[in-house]
């Protein structure tokens, strides 16, 4: 069936648009996400038109009332435009004209869909950035709570996924806190570059009407306006920057997820999953699966794909606006939804879904040679060149492995046979708690440093 719904631009054309092209061209199925922002932007535009005398105050009030009625209809579920409306902007304008008559046709004076959609996306993303930043803080708070409770809980630290040195569990958790802090700060910087108004740039070259762009920007809470209309309608740097920041958030969540998956396995056994945040198997009744971190790890690739897609979308576009830019919205919308969903899920998982198995952690830091570096440090502190000490300890580890002993199991005679500088205090030096406490350099895992790091983290949350 041929679609005969009249388009705002259709008087230039003869006949009707092919139904397949109507469907292909339409964005209403996804850009309806912008409707609240489109209405807000249009209200500001109507007020600006009245302020500058382009329309009367009475006309502006009719437009504002009509737009607010559409907002209520949408919230009540009574405004559900179909693909014949093409996009959210045309759908709103058509409904507005139905509500207020011909004055509705004046709303688009001194405005193009090009600057209109750019305004909508910025308003949308501005809100979403603030919401995500709040979610990051909630995530950080859960990490901080665990850190405060586990300053002196020890856990193996790894390099190459091989046990390296024991560390404070709080130190490990605070590493993710700092990653999240950078994410929070990065989004704040992107917010500033998003908070610039393109409204009034027109299709590409501005307008002949005596508009006041700074006034409409002020009404919408924008801090600046674009100084070049071509740039204003074609810029999507802010969206790419957001997806880049979103990708980094997902990198951090995915890394933590990978560790949660490993730690929940029988091979590690560092955490237990609560029933509220784990699932079972359809065939193996003994299973408790870490679906939440697995899904977060998987969804990271989805956000990375949106970033790559946006870069490829933009790389070949000549100035100014091109229909290709319709493809930016689904990437932005899904990127936002995915990041928010993953942040919420991981916050719940950390807050309610895991229990640290402290007995197992204590065993893990005492059952290997992760205190070997401290033996080398012990000798170096007694004047033995570090590299010489390092080589000696390597031989000690090799000998101990062959005899089935850990370093703590060697007798003092065995130690002194290896080097005369070993004394009885070697056992204190290689005890797990002392190994951790001794690393008291700024930013290290020493308990004194971790207590200070916890306080700094508290202050960061309080100031943000």
Curated annotation (Swiss-Prot):
Q: Give the primary localization class.
A: cytoplasm
What pathway, per the record?
Amino-acid biosynthesis; L-arginine biosynthesis; L-arginine from L-ornithine and carbamoyl phosphate: step 3/3
Q: Which UniProt keywords apply?
A: Amino-acid biosynthesis, Arginine biosynthesis, Cytoplasm, Lyase
Instruction: State whether keyword Glycosyltransferase applies.
Output: no
Of the GO CC terms on this record, one is: cytosol
Coiled coil segments of this chain: none
EC code(s) of this entry: 4.3.2.1
Pfam families according to UniProt: ASL_C2, Lyase_1
Q: Where in the cell is it found?
A: Cytoplasm
Q: Which GO terms describe its molecular function?
A: argininosuccinate lyase activity
Signal sequence: where? none
- Per its UniProt record, what InterPro entries does this chain match? Arg_succ_lyase_C, Argininosuccinate_lyase, Fumarase/histidase_N, Fumarate_lyase_CS, Fumarate_lyase_fam, Fumarate_lyase_N, L-Aspartase-like
One GO biological-process annotation of the entry reads: arginine biosynthetic process via ornithine
| Top-level taxon of origin | Bacteria
- Principal EC category: lyase
Q: Which reaction does it catalyse?
A: 2-(N(omega)-L-arginino)succinate = fumarate + L-arginine
Q: Its family?
A: Belongs to the lyase 1 family. Argininosuccinate lyase subfamily.
Which PANTHER family does the entry mention? ARGININOSUCCINATE LYASE
Q: What is this protein called?
A: Argininosuccinate lyase
Species source reads Crocosphaera subtropica (strain ATCC 51142 / BH68)
This protein's encoding gene: argH
């Amino acid at each position: 069936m041929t679609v005969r719904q009249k388009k705002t631009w259709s008087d230039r054309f003869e006949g009707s648009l092919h139904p397949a092209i109507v469907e292909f061209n339409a964005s209403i199925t996804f850009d309806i996400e912008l409707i609240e922002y489109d209405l807000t932007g249009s209200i500001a535009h109507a007020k600006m038109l009245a302020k500058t005398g382009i329309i009367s105050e009475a006309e502006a009030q009719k437009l504002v009332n009509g737009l607010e009625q559409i907002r209520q209809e949408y919230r009540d579920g009574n405004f559900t435009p179909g693909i014949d409306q093409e996009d959210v902007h045309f759908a709103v304008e058509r409904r507005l004209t139905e509500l207020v008559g011909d004055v509705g046709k004046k709303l688009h004076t001194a405005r193009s869909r090009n600057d209109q959609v750019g305004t909508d996306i910025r308003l949308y993303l501005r809100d979403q950035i603030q919401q995500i930043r709040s979610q990051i803080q909630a995530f950080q708070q859960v990490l901080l709570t665990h850190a405060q409770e586990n300053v002196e809980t020890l856990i193996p630290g790894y390099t190459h996924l091989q046990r390296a040195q024991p560390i404070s569990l709080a130190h490990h958790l605070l590493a993710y806190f700092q990653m999240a802090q950078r994410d929070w700060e990065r989004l704040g910087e992107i917010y500033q570059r998003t908070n610039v108004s393109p409204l009034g740039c027109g299709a590409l070259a501005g307008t002949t009407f005596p508009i006041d762009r700074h006034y409409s920007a002020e009404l919408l809470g924008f801090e600046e306006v674009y100084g070049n209309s071509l740039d204003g309608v074609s810029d999507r740097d802010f969206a790419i920057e957001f997806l880049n920041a979103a990708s980094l958030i997902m990198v951090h969540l995915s890394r933590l997820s990978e560790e949660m998956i490993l730690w929940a396995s029988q091979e590690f056994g560092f955490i237990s999953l609560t029933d509220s945040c784990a699932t079972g198997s359809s065939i193996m009744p003994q299973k408790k699966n870490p679906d939440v971190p697995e899904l977060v790890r998987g969804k990271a690739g989805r956000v990375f794909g949106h970033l790559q897609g946006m870069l490829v979308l933009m790389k070949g576009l000549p100035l100014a606006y091109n229909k290709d830019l319709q493809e930016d919205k689904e990437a932005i919308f899904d990127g936002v939804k995915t990041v928010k969903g993953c942040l919420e899920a991981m916050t719940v998982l950390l807050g309610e879904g895991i229990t640290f198995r402290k007995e197992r952690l204590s065993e893990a830091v005492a059952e290997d040679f992760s205190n070997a570096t401290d033996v080398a440090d012990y000798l170096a502190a007694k004047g033995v060149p570090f590299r010489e000490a390092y080589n000696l300890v390597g031989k000690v580890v090799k000998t101990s492995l062959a005899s089935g002993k850990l370093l703590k199991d060697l007798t003092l005679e065995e130690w002194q046979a290896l080097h005369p500088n070993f004394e009885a205090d070697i056992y204190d030096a290689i005890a797990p708690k002392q190994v951790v406490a001794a690393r008291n350099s700024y930013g290290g895992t020493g308990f004194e440093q971790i207590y200070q790091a916890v306080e700094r983290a508290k202050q960061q949350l309080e100031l943000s």
